């Protein structure tokens, strides 16, 4: 479950920036994503996408099924099919977005949020879990 601080900050952010928010994902759509990608969605990510859809939060792109217009037409399924070959154990990771340089950001099976730099072939830990990742994004100025 998303922590209270993160949830309150997200609600306030999307009240000020409604165009950055996508359309919430349904239970059936969550099941379809899990089946299509053969992964179990992280609980915090699932709650996020079921509340806010695919969004832009500050400078972070977080994909879902129904994305903000800023993210275009690609869904989280499309994103994972496009980028999973870049990652070791790519099929067991859930790619949730990219940075400004096209590097995939993903949730690992251990729930850690990571980024893969395709130019240097390096992995970097961004946060211990999805809620922490959101909190770091929301605290950026």
Describe the residue ranges of each PLM region.
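Short, solvent-exposed aromatic-acidic interface loops
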Residues: 118-122
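Metal-dependent nuclease catalytic cores in nucleic-acid-processing enzymes
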Residues: 136-139
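A surface-exposed partner-binding patch
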Residues: 1-105, 141
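Short acidic-glycine loop/turn motifs at beta-strand connectors
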Residues: 108-111
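Compact, glycine/acidic-enriched structural inserts
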Residues: 123, 127, 131-134
């Amino acid at each position: 479950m998303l922590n209270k601080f993160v949830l309150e900050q997200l609600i306030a952010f999307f009240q000020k920036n409604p165009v950055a928010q996508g359309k919430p994902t349904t239970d059936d759509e969550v099941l379809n994503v899990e089946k299509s990608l053969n992964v179990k969605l992280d609980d915090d990510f699932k709650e996020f996408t079921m509340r806010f859809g695919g969004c832009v939060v500050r400078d972070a792109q977080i994909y879902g099924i129904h994305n903000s217009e800023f993210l275009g037409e690609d869904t989280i399924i499309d994103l994972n099919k496009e980028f999973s070959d870049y990652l070791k154990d790519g099929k067991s990771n859930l790619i949730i977005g990219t940075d400004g340089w096209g590097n995939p950001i993903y949730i690992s099976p251990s729930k850690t949020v990571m980024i893969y730099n395709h130019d240097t072939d390096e992995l970097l830990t961004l946060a211990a879990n999805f809620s922490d990742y959101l909190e770091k994004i929301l605290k950026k100025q």
